[in-house]
Amino acid sequence: MKIAVLGAGSWGTAIAIHLNKLNHQVRLWMRSKEQFEELIATRHNSRYLDVDLPSSILLYNDLDKAVEDSEVVVIAVPSHAVREVSEKLKGKISKNAIVVNLAKGIETSSLKRMSEVIKEYLLNPVVVLSGPSHAEEVVRQIPTACVLASEDVKACEFIQEAFMNETFRLYVNTDVIGVELGGALKNIIALGAGISDGLGFGDNTKAALMTRGLAEITRLGVAMGSDPLTFLGLAGVGDLIVTCTSNYSRNRRAGILIGKGKSLKEALKEIGMVVEGVNTTKSAYRLSQIYGVEMPITKEIYSIIFENKNPFEAVYNLMTRDKKHELHGI
């Protein structure tokens, strides 16, 4: 099967190598000419994952050639680039091609989910792939389970068949809203978990952040039309656990630096790669106001990273809020 993977960052590189092992004809496209020339010369991705690319993976800097005759097009660029790439794909891919989106985020300007942005330009079936899936582990064939979501069940099942093997298991879900929100919003809570670690707090604090974070993710999700049970699955609890606890998590690592006193700008510079939770915090904060949903953790993280609020003060505010029933608003 001809599969185009758009984006040669960590996720794009990992999924390209995975699909190549399944004997698909993989075309890996990257926007950066510098990165393209380096990979052509060395077949080694030094910036992302530090891995070698098999010679059977075809490399492209020309988007039109990369997607030509592709049966599946995988969008593996950061969320802020999804609109640009989707617009460039318009009229360039087969009407029968299935688009698989890996980006986890909410567009800051429009507050749209990634599949909504893609559908502005493409009439193709769009399948969302989400769940606890650090690229560093996927590329090493460490057992991983994720979820596929689409309104088109047949498209989901087609991708399930094409992408799945003994180390990469995929489930099908029709709740696109819930799967996308779970994948995006957990990055905010991971920032908070990192801030907690940076402040020197313990496991109790992180467990509370994760659990109450899941509660506010669920509240917003339900208000936006998703099934609350989705957040108990791989795109919800699963992704939340791995992103809040792993050293691979850029969001957690950025949070740790902020908790230790660095500014957002300093933290992002030190990470050196996209930290999706930063823009998602802006989007979620606005969505909570639009939908009238209580998201106290998101609100405090917003105040810390965008308004320079003292993290200790933010924790105090969370701990001294009005008394609540645990399932309030769910």
UniProtKB/Swiss-Prot annotation:
Q: Where in the cell is it found?
A: Cytoplasm
Taxonomically, the superkingdom here is: Bacteria
A biological process (GO) of this protein is: glycerol-3-phosphate biosynthetic process
| Lipid metabolism recorded as keyword | yes
**Residues the record marks as active site:** 186 (proton acceptor)
Q: Which PROSITE patterns match?
A: NAD_G3PDH
GO function terms (MF aspect)? glycerol-3-phosphate dehydrogenase [NAD(P)+] activity; NAD binding
- A cellular component term, taken from the record's GO annotations: cytosol
Q: Where does NADPH bind?
A: 10-11, 31, 104, 135, 250, 274, 276
Protein keywords: Cytoplasm, Lipid biosynthesis, Lipid metabolism, NAD, NADP, Nucleotide-binding, Oxidoreductase, Phospholipid biosynthesis, Phospholipid metabolism
Binding of sn-glycerol 3-phosphate, residues? 104, 131, 133, 186, 239, 249-251
Kindly give the InterPro entries that the UniProt entry links to this protein: 6-PGluconate_DH-like_C_sf, 6PGD_dom2, G3P_DH_NAD-dep, G3P_DH_NAD-dep_C, G3P_DH_NAD-dep_N, NAD(P)-bd_dom_sf
Q: EC number(s) on record? A: 1.1.1.94
- Catalytic reaction annotation: sn-glycerol 3-phosphate + NAD(+) = dihydroxyacetone phosphate + NADH + H(+); sn-glycerol 3-phosphate + NADP(+) = dihydroxyacetone phosphate + NADPH + H(+)
Where does this protein act, in terms of pathway?
Answer: Membrane lipid metabolism; glycerophospholipid metabolism
Free-text function comment from the UniProt entry: Catalyzes the reduction of the glycolytic intermediate dihydroxyacetone phosphate (DHAP) to sn-glycerol 3-phosphate (G3P), the key precursor for phospholipid synthesis.
The family assignment reads: Belongs to the NAD-dependent glycerol-3-phosphate dehydrogenase family.
Kindly provide the name given to this protein in its UniProt entry.
Glycerol-3-phosphate dehydrogenase [NAD(P)+]
Look up and give the organism this protein is from. Caldanaerobacter subterraneus subsp. tengcongensis (strain DSM 15242 / JCM 11007 / NBRC 100824 / MB4) (Thermoanaerobacter tengcongensis)
From which lineage does this chain's organism come?
Bacteria, Bacillati, Bacillota, Clostridia, Thermoanaerobacterales
